[in-house]
Amino acid sequence: ATQSVDRALRGYMSWEQLRELQAAGFGIGSQTHSHPHMHRLSVAKNRDELTVSNERFLTELGMRPSLFAYPYGEYSIDVINEVKQAGFIAAFGQHSGIAHGYDGFFELPRFAMNEQYGSRDRLELAINGLPLKVNQIVPEDVVLAENPPSYGFTLSGDMDQERQLRCFNSRYGKLDVAILGRRAEIR
């Protein structure tokens, strides 16, 4: 978040440090100006967050990042559209998973590797993971209005493990999954 860099907040890199990384060939990505919960903001406010951030990168580094990470990993269809309009070529959520050809470039998964989830075992799990290739996900928008939601997806043609599929909820444990051919619906 460029605001944190501008304010020289403790624990954040400075513009000078970012320039050093850039000069050494590292890629620099973006995450808005003030790091808000974007799905809660209006389209105009999100556009402003992205514009201000891009302007700060242009001023300080002479470039606009092409990659974006949603603050807190949160996004909606409206947020994705604004990120695309701002000129980014891809964006990352904060949901664990393996990217594959069925993922949209603006909903890429990433494994968190931090003090809580940064063990060697976790790194090995992430490196050796395989994608769950799905499409036709319902609901399309990850910001849900209905609780509990109706949720379903179709396994890609090269996935043949539908009978082994298990889904879990952090509060309720294992969920009932109805398998209808290649379609899975959580009920």
Positions of the model-derived regions?
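Residues that line or immediately flank small-molecule/substrate-binding pockets and catalytic motifs
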Residues: 72, 95, 112-115
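Short histidine
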Residues: 97, 103-107, 116-117
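Acidic, His- and aromatic-enriched active-site or binding-groove loops in soluble protein domains
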Residues: 88-97
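Terminal accessory/targeting
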Residues: 1-13, 35, 112-187
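Metal-dependent polysaccharide deacetylase catalytic core of the NodB/CE4 family, i.e.
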Residues: 1-79, 89, 102-109
